[in-house]
Amino acid sequence: MSQLYASLFYQRDVTEIFSDRALVSYMVEAEVALAQAQAQVGVIPQSAATVIERAAKTAIDKIDFDALATATGLAGNIAIPFVKQLTAIVKDADEDAARYVHWGATSQDILDTACILQCRDALAIVQNQVQQCYETALSQAQTYRHQVMMGRTWLQQALPITLGHKLARWASAFKRDLDRINAIKARVLVAQLGGAVGSLASLQDQGSIVVEAYAKQLKLGQTACTWHGERDRIVEIASVLGIITGNVGKMARDWSLMMQTEIAEVFEPTAKGRGGSSTMPHKRNPVAAASVLAAANRVPALMSSIYQSMVQEHERSLGAWHAEWLSLPEIFQLTAGALERTLDVLKGMEVNAENMHQNIECTHGLIMAEAVMMALAPHMGRLNAHHVVEAACKTAVAEQKHLKDIISQVDEVKQYFNPSQLDEIFKPESYLGNIQDQIDAVLQEAKGEAK
């Protein structure tokens, strides 16, 4: 992506993890781990592994990235020209040790392992971001647990809720995101080492012990078998990121709608140069929401490519594996960027309680129609109560009067409720159901005390 847009859509640390320089550094790390693992079990001399490790410490500064980029276009992947350059760097230190660089491995072993190392570090950042969003949403849910506002369905006013309930639901989504991240780690953060067709025939009868030592060197999990052609691990990582981005996309949709001029209930935090218009000085645009929604729009398209990459030929694929190199880094960067902007809004959101109250009142009591119906239902049955309230609603709309004024004159209603009882029925805060219980449950879950 253009650097001009990076600050709008990405997060700096995750973008750095997926930079060219970082990728090559992870590949160097994989090659060093391979050499040390093989030396540990006697496949190559320890002296060679020591030289390779020593040379690797300065290798990143000696790699010719321009030449690497040109050669990658000819070779079909970065590993082939990378290994040539790394071998030359080691050769400058010790010609004999250079013979053991990339011993027994194939290009995909190094690239897949480097990819997993990238995922491990990027996932740690994403997890921390989600944790911060979770904690902030919990805090705000507690702060606004009694702030009554309109609940909306099909973009229409429905029944009263509280802002704290909305935020508790968001917090609960973040909790599930954290659970998903934790659930996949052992399954997906694993090393790849299989040689040309996954058999490690190049290492003869020492393949299994080398794989074990290799994974331990990298602090990655060891798999029962190679996974060159079975890409479900990559897909699972991307899928969790896709869910996270979708979750924050839903939140951004909500707060952007609440920022509409006619609603004006919640606003993104202000900052110099933020949210303005080039032609309309009065505008306060939901810039963070635009960024998050763009990510939530883009990630599903990238996920389509990731899912299609599962259908691979035989032991190692042509093209499908390569498509991951384009999609996965972008998914990570967009997810991290969306989380960063969501956290900013959660921390600095501005709430207009007066507008929330005015929006509740703008229907002149119609939003309390269900409350009236349910209060009448025990006396006359739900269906009859529905008919009575429905007729009153139509009259209130036609005469442009408050529903309470109309319903209070209905004989069937006067029979059961006096004016003070009707006043209580029409209070939005009296018709919030079990919202407070739900908020408590979300807060307790965060303490490990889920009911």
From Swiss-Prot:
In terms of Gene3D superfamilies, this protein maps to: Fumarase/aspartase (C-terminal domain) (1.10.40.30), Fumarase/aspartase (Central domain) (1.20.200.10), Fumarase/aspartase (N-terminal domain) (1.10.275.10)
Reactions listed under catalytic activity: 2-(carboxymethyl)-5-oxo-2,5-dihydro-2-furoate = 3-carboxy-cis,cis-muconate + H(+)
Q: Which UniProt keywords apply?
A: Aromatic hydrocarbons catabolism, Isomerase
| Example GO BP | 3,4-dihydroxybenzoate catabolic process
Q: Which SUPFAM superfamilies match?
A: L-aspartase-like
Residues forming coiled coils: none
- Is ATP-binding among the key words of this record? no
EC no.?
A: 5.5.1.2
Q: Which InterPro entries match?
A: AdenyloSucc_lyase_C, Fumarase/histidase_N, Fumarate_lyase_CS, Fumarate_lyase_fam, Fumarate_lyase_N, L-Aspartase-like, Protocat_PcaB-like
Domain of life where this protein originates: Bacteria
Does the record carry Nucleus as a key word?
no
Gene Ontology MF terms in the entry: 3-carboxy-cis,cis-muconate cycloisomerase activity; lyase activity
Q: Which CDD domains match?
A: pCLME (cd01597)
Pathway assigned in UniProt: Aromatic compound metabolism; beta-ketoadipate pathway; 5-oxo-4,5-dihydro-2-furylacetate from 3-carboxy-cis,cis-muconate: step 1/2
Q: Which Pfam families match?
A: ADSL_C, Lyase_1
- Which family, according to the similarity comment? Belongs to the class-II fumarase/aspartase family.
NCBIfam families (alphabetical): protocat_pcaB (TIGR02426)
Q: How does it assemble?
A: Homotetramer.
Function comment: Catalyzes an anti cycloisomerization.
What is the recorded name of this protein? 3-carboxy-cis,cis-muconate cycloisomerase
Q: Which gene encodes it?
A: pcaB
